[in-house]
């Protein structure tokens, strides 16, 4: 069975940053994504998070394309440096805030941790990669800057 994630939500910091972008004071700068194994209750409000609960891997953006006011971000996570496997239950996208530095912009958490994807440790023989595609609305943004990757 495939992992099920709740729709991504903007965090409190993400909403504040979006307001800055929309006001035209700064161009959006997406920096990276992270996956983790944090546990969330069904009613927990993930939008109040400032970080993942249990971050395990962090990667730059592999590719990005724009489709109107939607930014399609592709992240490729590899287990090459993973020594202990884990269940992927949270995904976060980070952005650069001109006043606060790097912030957790958006987060998506597992809808059902019993069917979360397992990210294995590197066996020494075979690498495993997992691709995440994340869609972000960038309404009113004239330019979007993608950092890293």
Question: Where are each of the predicted segments found?
Answer:
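N-terminal assembly/attachment segments of tailed bacteriophage virion structural proteins
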Residues: 1-148
């Amino acid at each position: 069975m495939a992992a099920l994630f709740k729709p991504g939500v903007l965090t409190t910091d993400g909403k504040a940053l979006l307001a800055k972008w929309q006001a035209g004071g700064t161009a959006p700068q997406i920096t990276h994504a992270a996956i983790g194994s944090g546990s969330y209750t069904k009613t927990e409000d993930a939008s109040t998070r400032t970080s993942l609960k249990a971050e395990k891997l962090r990667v730059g953006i592999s590719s990005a394309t724009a489709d109107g006011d939607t930014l399609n971000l592709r992240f490729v996570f590899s287990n090459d440096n993973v020594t202990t496997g884990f269940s992927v239950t949270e995904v976060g996208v980070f952005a650069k805030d001109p006043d606060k530095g790097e912030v957790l912009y958006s987060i998506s958490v597992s809808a059902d941790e019993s069917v979360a994807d397992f990210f294995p440790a590197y066996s020494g023989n075979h690498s495993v990669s997992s691709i995440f595609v994340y869609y972000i609305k960038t309404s009113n943004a004239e330019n979007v800057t993608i950092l890293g990757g």
